[in-house]
């Protein structure tokens, strides 16, 4: 057995094996590793961007919520002002209507009072004439009667 030839054969076989691996096995493995590294790096970058996007979205949502609250408060304030304005207008309108109704009532009362006074004057005049007729025991003619009633009404 020749130790040198075996060693030389094994060395040649090992060199061929290394060359074959370097030529055909190693490049696909390196490409697969590089692709995996790239995917991992892209995934980490995407995760970082997603975290930043999430943070920005949360900030934006918080700002929109604050704006919505401010807008809601403004709308409520406007509604309260409008409510107060409507109530005030209703009060003014009610006061005007009240004054109008009171004025109408007072005018009706005054008209009724004047009518009653006139009726009362006529009745008093008739009673006075009736009393005078009894006192005088004579009847006054209708023309004189009307004249006397009108004079008494005017005096009363």
UniProtKB/Swiss-Prot annotation:
Listed InterPro entries: ATP_synth_B-like_membr_sf, ATP_synth_b/b'su_bac/chlpt, ATP_synth_F0_bsu_bac, ATP_synthase_B_chain
Location in or out of the cell: Cell inner membrane
Main location: membrane
Transmembrane segments: 7-29
GO molecular function annotations of the record: proton-transporting ATP synthase activity, rotational mechanism; proton-transporting ATPase activity, rotational mechanism
Record's bilayer topology term: Single-pass membrane protein
Function: F(1)F(0) ATP synthase produces ATP from ADP in the presence of a proton or sodium gradient. F-type ATPases consist of two structural domains, F(1) containing the extramembraneous catalytic core and F(0) containing the membrane proton channel, linked together by a central stalk and a peripheral stalk. During catalysis, ATP synthesis in the catalytic domain of F(1) is coupled via a rotary mechanism of the central stalk subunits to proton translocation.
Family designation: Belongs to the ATPase B chain family.
Summary of subunit composition and partner proteins: F-type ATPases have 2 components, F(1) - the catalytic core - and F(0) - the membrane proton channel. F(1) has five subunits: alpha(3), beta(3), gamma(1), delta(1), epsilon(1). F(0) has three main subunits: a(1), b(2) and c(10-14). The alpha and beta chains form an alternating ring which encloses part of the gamma chain. F(1) is attached to F(0) by a central stalk formed by the gamma and epsilon chains, while a peripheral stalk is formed by the delta and b chains.
Protein name, entry field: ATP synthase subunit b
Source species: Shewanella frigidimarina (strain NCIMB 400)
